[in-house]
Every structure is written in C-alpha cells, then in structure tokens.
Swiss-Prot record:
Lineage summary: Bacteria, Bacillati, Bacillota, Bacilli, Lactobacillales
Major location category of this protein: cytoplasm
Subunit comment: Homodimer.
GO terms for biological process, alphabetical: negative regulation of DNA-templated transcription; response to redox state
Protein name (record): Redox-sensing transcriptional repressor Rex
C-alpha cells in the first residue's frame, strides 16, 4: 500500500468520515473479517460506495481492484491518521451540566483520549476539587498558566456563548491548536487553529424539521 498522509486541503466532509472508517475496520478485525469492499463498507456505515472510493483515493492505493481492502491494514492506517497510537490529553472548560457529563464520559474505553484538567469560574463549588477519577477542577484564571506547563494539546469548550471567544483566545495563547466548541457561536481564531463547533440546539432543530417533513 502506498504510504500517504492527508494534506491540509483534505475536504472537511472526508475528514469527518475518518472516525467512521476507523471504527468500522476496527470492528471488522475484531470479527475476524480479513477483507472487504466499498459496497460492503457502504452498507455498514450508510455512505455511498462512490464517496468511499473517492475518499480512499485521496490517500493513495488503499486497496486493489478486484481484491478489495484488507481490514487490518486499513484499521492501522486510519488509526494512525487519528492518532490512536498515542494518548491525547484534553482540557475541559466549563463544568456545568454538559461539562459534568463529559467529565464522566469514558473516552479512554473507546480510544486514547482523556480529560486530564477541567476549569470553571470561582463561583462554581466544584472549583478546587477533583472528580472521583482524580481529574482536578481549576479556576479559569489558571487556564493559560496550567496548560502551558502541561502536555495538553486540545480542549473542549462547554461555556456560555458570551464567554466562549475569551476562552478560545486564552487557549490559543496557551498553544492549543485544536478545540471542540459546544457554545452556539462562531469563534474567530487564527488560520492555523481548528475549532469544531457543535450546536446541539441547531442539530435538534434539524431533526425536528426532518420529523415534520416526513409527516407530510
């Protein structure tokens, strides 16, 4: 297989499908399936076969015509792309209802990501304590200083939208280049910083649209 890495110009839609591909090939290997093809992959993940072949072509020769794809090879390939061979430490900013749920989410049971620090404002009674798993919850004023001293490379923002820009600015100063944002606001960041935003209200409204549309 040709050794290819994705370029920074990899389409965003393709990048979003990478975890799906990794999970599928990991599952197939665990089921002792040694080989598959784009049609079978399509049936498993609900993406059309042509799109899958186009995605894979961006990385070089991941398979062979008439032979298909070796599941273990592609599991390892996509796992490496997604950094599954290294542990990723995450800072969580905002320990409200959503933040507390994220603190208890077992990222590490599924991959090598784990929250190692959490932050909130001084008015939150959890500040100065730690979770049952030993994750310290710091005052937000210590964010830049602590992150700079740590090996944290990514962050999750679970804060009010009016505070989100200030928080991401602080993260950028601390050297964080990748963040997941749950605040319903578009954040302004430098061109070398990536922010993936998830607006839960917007996602639910979209689902409601499809639900109502199906009734007609």
């Amino acid at each position: 297989m040709t050794d290819h890495k994705p370029s920074k110009s990899l389409p965003k839609a393709t990048a979003k499908r990478l975890p799906q591909y990794y999970r599928l090939f990991k599952s197939l290997v665990e089921e002792n399936v040694t080989r598959t093809n784009s049609q079978l992959i399509s049936e498993k993940i609900g993406v059309d076969a042509a799109t899958i072949r186009r995605d894979f072509s961006l990385f070089g020769e991941l398979g062979r015509r008439g032979y298909g794809y070796e599941t273990k090879v592609l599991r390892d390939f996509f796992g490496e792309l997604l950094g599954q061979d290294q542990e990723t430490h995450i800072a969580l900013i905002g320990v409200g209802n959503l933040g507390r749920a994220l603190l208890h989410y077992q990222f590490q049971d599924r991959n090598k990501m784990r929250i190692t620090q959490a932050y909130d404002i001084s008015g939150n009674p959890l500040v100065g304590t730690q979770t049952d798993d030993g994750i310290p919850i710091y005052n937000i004023s210590d964010l830049e200083k602590n992150v700079k001293k740590s090996d944290i490379k990514t962050a999750i923002l679970s804060v009010r939208k009016e505070n989100a820009q200030e928080v991401v600015d602080t993260l950028v100063k601390a050297g964080i280049k990748v963040s997941l944002n749950f605040a319903p606001i578009r954040l302004k960041v430098p061109s070398d910083v990536v922010v993936q935003s998830i607006d839960l209200t917007k996602e639910l409204q979209t689902l409601l649209f499809f639900m109502n549309d199906n009734k007609q």
